[in-house]
From Swiss-Prot:
InterPro entries: L-lactate/malate_DH, L-lactate_DH, L-lactate_DH_AS, Lactate/malate_DH_C, Lactate/malate_DH_N, Lactate_DH/Glyco_Ohase_4_C, NAD(P)-bd_dom_sf. Pfam families: Ldh_1_C (PF02866), Ldh_1_N (PF00056). One of its GO terms (cellular component) is cytoplasm. PANTHER family: L-2-HYDROXYCARBOXYLATE DEHYDROGENASE (NAD(P)(+)), L-LACTATE DEHYDROGENASE. One of its GO terms (molecular function) is L-lactate dehydrogenase activity. Substrate binds at Q79, R85, N117, P118, V119, D120, D145, T146, A147, R148, T226. Beta-D-fructose 1,6-bisphosphate binds at R150, H165. Pathway: Fermentation; pyruvate fermentation to lactate; (S)-lactate from pyruvate: step 1/1. Homotetramer. This is L-lactate dehydrogenase. GO terms for biological process: glycolytic process; lactate metabolic process. Catalyzes the conversion of lactate to pyruvate. NCBIfam families: L-LDH-NAD (TIGR01771). The gene is ldh.
């Protein structure tokens, strides 16, 4: 199985490293405009293969992604401290368009996973430019936001994160929302569970959600980038699709003519179906507002591209 990754930065290499530990890839190609860095990262990664399954890892050019089973995109300008993900739009849309053309040319049958931010906007651009079936173009969406919230709740409540079931949907960013009406711990409403919690130092659930929303900003401020958790999450996505596990993930998927974070069942061909999550009236309104935020930035990205084209 062949995986190609655009971007040899911290996120791209964290994904590659996590993928090595899944032991599913026979071949891996790392593509970056800084070929020297890509070669150095590949050499470092290759030295770990004696401890894992053998994998042919190379630093390459776009044509080296030929006939990939998966193409993962992490390339683009990175998010600065305090910067909104959506403010990255104009800088990254052009890069994604160039990559889309290369994927379409060399790996037209690949499943494409976009990690670059703003992930919802860029996943839409990627789908539109490749003209692939939307089921095979997936953004990481709110997969990490959902995981962060589950981890925070699990730590506070003294349970396994795997026993916390809650979805964060919408934009991977400031307008995302938590589906409180469906959030449970061990099948019990999360708010009901907390009524019987013996932890006397509990942080209010709403505050945990705010911590989740601000987690990336905090990590960027302290260490410069988020890379380890998203590396693990992306590798888990690839593995679950490759193994046809039919797992539910909150990923950025196509609906209502945009890409947005929503629970979906993923199988060997990509998105199999969206989970019919029932939202209450407040959640529906918040979800619609999040859609409008994404639509706004899609329009801005398209506008900037038209202006650039007309000036050339």
């Amino acid at each position: 199985m062949k995986v190609s990754i655009f971007g040899a930065g911290r996120v791209g290499i964290s994904i590659a490293y996590s993928l090595l530990h899944t032991k599913i890839a026979d071949e891996m190609v790392i593509v970056d405009i800084d070929i020297k860095r890509a070669e150095g990262e590949v050499l470092d990664l290759y030295h770990s293969t004696p401890f894992l399954k053998r994998c042919n890892i190379t630093a390459g050019n776009p044509h080296d992604i030929l006939n990939s089973d998966f193409v993962i995109i992490t390339a683009g300008a990175s998010q600065s401290a305090g910067e909104s993900r959506l403010s990255l739009t104009k800088r990254n849309v052009k890069i994604i368009r160039q990559i889309a053309a290369q994927i379409k040319k060399y790996s037209p049958d690949a499943i494409v996973i976009n990690v670059s931010n703003p992930v919802d906007v860029l996943s839409y651009v990627l789908w539109k430019e490749t003209k692939f079936n939307w089921r095979k173009v997936i953004g990481t969406g709110t997969i990490l936001d959902t995981a962060r919230f589950r981890a925070l709740v699990a730590k506070q409540c003294g349970v396994s994160p795997m026993s916390v079931h809650a979805y964060i949907i919408g934009e991977h960013g400031d307008s995302e929302l938590l589906v409180w009406s469906n959030a449970t711990i061990g099948g019990v409403s999360i708010k009901r569970f907390c009524q019987f919690c013996t932890n006397k130092n509990c942080t209010p659930l709403e505050s945990l959600f705010e911590q989740t929303k601000n987690a990336a900003y905090e990590i960027i401020e302290k260490k410069g980038a988020t890379n380890l958790a998203i590396g693990t999450a992306t590798a888990a996505l690839v593995e679950s699709i490759y193994r046809d596990e039919k797992r539910v993930w909150t990923v950025s998927v196509f609906q209502d003519n945009l890409y947005i974070g929503f629970p979906a069942i993923l199988g060997k061909n990509g998105v199999e179906k969206l989970v019919p999550v029932k939202l209450n009236s407040v959640e529906k309104e918040a979800f619609e507002r999040s859609k409008e935020v994404i639509k706004k930035y899609i329009k801005e990205g398209e506008k900037s591209e038209r202006e650039e084209s007309s000036s050339n």
